[in-house]
Amino acid sequence: RPNPCPGILGHEIIGKIEQLGDEVRNDLRGNPLSLNDRITWTEYFYSGQSYYRDIHDMPQKSPGVRKYGHDLVEEDPHFLGGFAEYCYILPGTGILKLPDAITDEEATPLNCGVATMISITEASKINMGDTVVVQGLGLLGLYGCAIAKARGARLVIGLDSVKERLSIAERFGAD
């Protein structure tokens, strides 16, 4: 994916609503949005029709999709990266209001790392009672362990050459 320069990096973003557009009323789940609500949003924005959006429910793969943290700062709107003080959220972006029980640190990876592993575990069709092997227990592997266990895997086997990661993986559901 191109990463034009100069740009404002950052695509796993948490923020507070400073201003709402006239047509923005609710988040992805239908929760009402208000000023100062703590939110996160999809790392991409795409509002047109496309084969990927309409057939596969994957608008992020559509031709012409734009992604936060991957745009020129010189193009309007200028604030499209998470490292900016403010970020302009464009139409076609999914917004999710965060509950107080989830910290910023816990919520930050939801749009990329966790979403990636949810997609992988769904495609793998993990069922209740299955045995799952997760090779590599870095951040994505840890999410994979937790999600596989939450989906009903009876046994989650974590593999990694770094010994310390094995004990960490146990806290994420690896057996």
Q: Positions of the model-derived regions?
A:
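Glycine-rich beta-strand-centered segment in the early N-terminal region that forms part
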Residues: 1-54, 99-101
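A general structural signal for well-ordered alpha-helical segments in protein cores
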Residues: 2, 14, 83-84, 95, ...
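A general structural signal for stabilizing positions within well-ordered secondary structure
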Residues: 7, 30, 77-78, 147, ...
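Glycine-centered flexibility sites
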Residues: 10, 15, 21, 36, ...
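ATP/adenylate-binding site constellation spanning eukaryotic-like Ser/Thr protein kinases
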Residues: 10, 55, 92, 113-114, ...
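Cysteine-cluster motifs in flexible loop/terminal segments that predominantly coordinate metals
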Residues: 32, 42-96, 100
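Mid-domain Rossmann-like dinucleotide-binding core that forms the NAD(H)/NADP(H) cofactor-binding site
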Residues: 86, 99-175
